[in-house]
């Protein structure tokens, strides 16, 4: 199923998901340093593997994914299947509602 078929996302619910499943390795704060994973500020419209100052896997650089609603929706289902060789150890979010909520939060919170 694609993002077009996903339920509407709830940013408040997405923030809770981010805090429990993503914030250990990522931040969304503009100007903040990288953690275990890259800072996600400015995520939408950016190409994978291009955030300055973060050491990406060759897989993330070579995939050259342009991050947006559709690519994030597919990636967050199963990151290691979407980008084989990624350093991200997160197994993914199986529920379409969880992915839609997280993407709604990321769209709001990462606007540069």
UniProtKB/Swiss-Prot annotation:
Binds 1 heme c group covalently per subunit. Coiled coil: none annotated. This is Cytochrome c. The lineage of its organism: Eukaryota, Viridiplantae, Streptophyta, Embryophyta, Tracheophyta. Electron carrier protein. The oxidized form of the cytochrome c heme group can accept an electron from the heme group of the cytochrome c1 subunit of cytochrome reductase. Cytochrome c then transfers this electron to the cytochrome oxidase complex, the final protein carrier in the mitochondrial electron-transport chain. The modification N-acetylalanine is found at residue 1. It comes from the Eukaryota. Belongs to the cytochrome c family. One of its GO terms (molecular function) is heme binding. Changing residue 112 to S: In 50% of the molecules. It is found in: Mitochondrion intermembrane space. Keywords: Acetylation, Electron transport, Heme, Iron, Metal-binding, Methylation, Mitochondrion, Respiratory chain, Transport. The modification N6,N6,N6-trimethyllysine is found at residues 80, 94. Heme c binds at residues 22, 25-26, 88. InterPro entries: Cyt_c-like_dom (IPR009056), Cyt_c-like_dom_sf (IPR036909), Cyt_c_1A/1B (IPR002327). One of its GO terms (cellular component) is mitochondrial intermembrane space. The keyword Transport applies.
């Amino acid at each position: 199923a694609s993002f077009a078929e996903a339920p509407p996302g709830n940013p408040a619910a997405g923030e809770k998901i981010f805090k429990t499943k993503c914030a250990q390795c990522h931040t969304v704060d503009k100007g903040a340093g990288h953690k275990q994973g890259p800072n996600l500020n400015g995520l939408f419209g950016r190409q994978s593997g291009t955030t300055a100052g973060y050491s990406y896997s060759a897989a993330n650089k070579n995939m050259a994914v342009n991050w947006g609603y559709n690519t994030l929706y597919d990636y967050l289902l199963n990151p290691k299947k979407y980008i084989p060789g990624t350093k991200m150890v997160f197994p993914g979010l199986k529920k379409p509602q969880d992915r839609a909520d997280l993407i709604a939060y990321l769209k709001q919170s990462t606007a540069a």
